[in-house]
């Protein structure tokens, strides 16, 4: 009987030990501590993987604050680590977010292709954000990181990030069909401008290369051996509601999800003399923890504490990250 099975390990140890994982998304409602959790997971992965990259797709870019170090759109080594790198992208910026080096080349075609591609993409509603993800994926795959952790924006953006391979595949198909019709005109136009080495094939080669990578990424996203999603929530109604919606959407998209982090919990021992507000919050959290236990009995549910101080800086994150591997137990306070 299923009811007789022991509960799953209340930690992220299963993810850290799963060597086949290539992409790990961490997401949930705003304000639940996603960045702290994703940064802590990246730190633990760095202990067992050759190279780890954490990418922030949230325009707020909180990982710079978390590690107390400025990150950019180029992967940068995190201070205090040899194999942990971080980068921040703004999906709303489209192709302009890409490093300029991506479009460098010996001929004029690559130098003008960025602007031309941006104009072509703007003609397809909804694809701009997806294309920025696509180009980042293309860059990241070329760097061969062992595993990539995504610190995602709140739920709506996250679902678009998950769906971007399908959007890009559909959009690039349209662009390539359009290219077949416009190729003679484009070649004639650039020749008039004196750029003889620019042709439609040069531009479309970028699109062909990207489509090949995105098709591969799309397959990997649907493979539970290579991709999983970690939902972060707090023990409150709206956060739990958002988490359930996210789990359902991820399941619909074919994305594996079997880990939930419940963050910012009060751990009040029997001997703990708490204030009335703390006691009240504790009761509310216990109610929603019971609901989480019922809803997600086949999930690994990790419980993390609400701390007196912010988790900020490499050393602080290293210490806090241990709670992802070993279930947190509060220190008992002596009765007064």
Swiss-Prot record:
> Which Pfam families does the record cross-reference, listed alphabetically?
ArsA_ATPase
Q: Specify the superkingdom.
A: Eukaryota
Q: What subcellular compartments does it reside in?
A: Cytoplasm; Endoplasmic reticulum
* Gene Ontology MF terms: ATP binding; ATP hydrolysis activity; metal ion binding
Active-site residues annotated for this sequence: 58
Query: What InterPro entries does its record include?
Result: Anion-transp_ATPase-like_dom (IPR025723), ATPase_ArsA/GET3 (IPR016300), ATPase_ArsA/GET3_euk (IPR027542), P-loop_NTPase (IPR027417)
The EC designation for this entry is 3.6.-.-
Question: Quaternary state and partners of this protein?
Answer: Homodimer.
Looking up NCBIfam families in the UniProt record yields: GET3_arsA_TRC40
Question: How is this protein named in the record?
Answer: ATPase ASNA1 homolog
